[in-house]
Amino acid sequence: MNKNLKVLALKYRPKIFKDLIGQEIIAKTIYNSIKHDRSANAYLFTGIRGVGKTTIARIVAKSLNCLKGIDNLCSEDLCENCNAISNSNHIDVLEMDAASKTGVDDVRDLIEFSRYGPTSSKYKIFIIDEVHMLSKQAFNALLKLSLIHISEPTRPR
C-alpha cells in the first residue's frame, strides 16, 4: 500500500493560522498574542465536533515552538519542531485523549511530565482533547497542575 495516501481530512488539515476557515477572529487574536509575546498560560477551545478545536491547538503549539518564528511559520512542516508536532511525536508537546484516558493516574502522568522544563523547544505544551470526559478526581488533579503553573510559571530558555 502507498505510504503517501492520507485521509482527506488529514491531508488538508490547516497547518497555519491563515489556513483556518471560519475561525478568523480567534485565529487573529491568538496569532497577535503570540506575535507580541503575550500568550496565555492556557487556552480552552469549545464548540461542536469538527470545528477545528484540536487543529487550532496544534497550530498554537507550532506557533509557540516553530524554529522559524511565527511570521515564517512552516506551512509545509519544514522545521523539525513543526514536523514533529504535526506527526504527534514532539517530545515537548503532549497530546492526550481524555475520552479514553479518564483516570486520575493519567493526569498524574501529566503532572509528572510537567515537572521538567522543555527539552527541545521554547515551551512544553499539553493538548487535552475531550477534557470534559475526565473523572471528577482527574479533573481536580488537572486543576492542581494548572494552579502549580499559574503560581510558578516557567519562562522559556
What are these regions, as identified by a protein language model?
Residues 148-157:
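Single conserved hydrophobic/aromatic residue that forms the stacking wall/gate
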Residues 41, 121-125, 139, 151:
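Loop/turn-to-beta-strand initiation segments
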Residues 3-48, 111-120:
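Pre-Walker A (pre-P-loop) alpha-helix and adjacent loop at the N terminus of AAA/AAA+ ATPase modules
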Residues 118-134:
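Conserved P-loop NTPase "ATPase switch" module shared by AAA+ and STAND
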Residues 2-6, 35-36, 40-88:
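Walker A/P-loop
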Residues 91, 98-123:
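Short glycine-rich substrate-engagement loop in P-loop NTPases that contacts/grips substrate
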Residues 26, 103-106, 130, 134, ...:
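Helical "lid/switch" subdomain of P-loop NTPase nucleotide-binding domains
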Residues 20, 30, 45, 54-57, ...:
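Conserved RecA-like P-loop NTPase ATPase core
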